[in-house]
């Protein structure tokens, strides 16, 4: 996988290094200086067994209690042995990638024995991969691979330095004559622009689907989804603040329309025809996809929302003027949510409202909660529908 990267600013580097030192300080506090002075027994964590059970281990002799926090599951208490190592073994897990952390005396920590990370602006976790058959769309296979390009730029709309990622499919030629369709794929609240590649494996999913001729070759643009960066705060406003939420969506839309899309269409071989432009996202990104896409049908023909969250349930105000006439402009409106997701009821209300307006759409309920395990499957099911003569 080719990676084109520009170096981040000094401020970003200092911030990252500071975070590493903070984690080391916390880890030392829990491991204990005495424990560090001794040569510890070699540990392995996580350990994936042949029956898909997973054992997690964490050395913290001074901790009074430790739990395993795993994505989409209840916390599991861990047991300490005489060497001060806490461990727990799960039931067999479905093949997938799972975020997890150790909660030691109330403090969430990554697994120091595992280099695989799930980056997040508020809650970074470790990741365990429970491998499955090659037929799973997020499993890396021996197929032609696309490339990921990482861009940095100064946003005049938002007033900060930010980044975006672009996936180009296998065979993409920047000097060729072929023009490609584009999917603008948005992350969720507290994720950053890398979410769909670092955690969602969007590039792997596209590589596999394109190789199987289940998806059209396309570019995917994954940009930072915060029009109001202050919304990602432990102490300030949040998505629960309706005014800040609206500012976030509007500023994001303006940056997308005036900065991101023009840059993509200048730099890459993509079509400017609305019939070859799609937008989709998860959680906050799903709400942004609906807000941006359904209010700009002159720009987007394909719209997807996975577990969308943060949209006002006053849909008439959020989507003014949207009615059955939109059916003539939309090629696909695809709305999905997990049945155990805390947002299922708000998404069902959206589904009912769309029905009441006679707006044609696909409504998908799947097993699962508000997790990446659901969203990887959403993407794998959504992408094959894009840029077809007949979608819905």
Question: Can you say where each PLM-predicted feature lies in the sequence?
Answer:
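N-terminal secretory signal peptides that target proteins for export/translocation
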Residues: 1-17
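A periodicity- and composition-biased signal for non-globular, repetitive helical segments
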Residues: 12, 16-18, 32, 168
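Positively charged, low-complexity intrinsically disordered regions
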Residues: 11-13, 35, 54
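Non-catalytic cap/lid and distal C-terminal segments of serine-dependent acyl enzymes
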Residues: 42, 48-75, 80-392
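Bacterial N-terminal signal peptides
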Residues: 18-34
